[in-house]
């Protein structure tokens, strides 16, 4: 994959529950703590190294932000780091929370 692909929250939910991809949330710590997808890894500048050690470049990665804009830059960055398949989630956490209100966790 030379460029990231934009996917819907429904597609992301399906990939996540099939084990076909991991989910990262790039929002600020306060927003993440107030609510995030339960399986989301909070990806920040400080946690990037740990994420990359834990997940090889053959891992498909889905990036979630607030509304689906910032995730595009982060998705491109992950591709440049060597990840084979990266997705940006359209609508971000706002769309996830609207579509899957029962699938939201709180806390860091």
Curated annotation (Swiss-Prot):
Record keyword Cytoplasm present: yes
GO biological process assignments: glycerol metabolic process
Keyword Repeat: no
Primary localization: cytoplasm
CDD domains linked: GlpE_ST (cd01444)
EC number(s) given by UniProt: 2.8.1.1
Enzyme class, broadest EC rank: transferase
Keywords tagged on the record: Cytoplasm, Transferase
Ranges of residues in domain Rhodanese: 17-105
A Gene Ontology molecular function term of the record: thiosulfate-cyanide sulfurtransferase activity
Disulfide cross-links: none
Subcellular location per the Swiss-Prot or TrEMBL entry: Cytoplasm
Active site: 65 (cysteine persulfide intermediate)
Domain of life, per lineage: Bacteria
GO cellular component, one term: cytoplasm
Entry-linked Pfam families: Rhodanese
Catalytic reaction annotation: thiosulfate + hydrogen cyanide = thiocyanate + sulfite + 2 H(+); thiosulfate + [thioredoxin]-dithiol = [thioredoxin]-disulfide + hydrogen sulfide + sulfite + 2 H(+)
Similarity-based family: Belongs to the GlpE family.
Function as written in the Swiss-Prot or TrEMBL entry: Transferase that catalyzes the transfer of sulfur from thiosulfate to thiophilic acceptors such as cyanide or dithiols. May function in a CysM-independent thiosulfate assimilation pathway by catalyzing the conversion of thiosulfate to sulfite, which can then be used for L-cysteine biosynthesis.
PANTHER family, alphabetized: FAD-DEPENDENT OXIDOREDUCTASE (PTHR43031), THIOSULFATE SULFURTRANSFERASE GLPE (PTHR43031:SF6)
Protein name: Thiosulfate sulfurtransferase GlpE
Organism this protein belongs to: Salmonella typhimurium (strain LT2 / SGSC1412 / ATCC 700720)
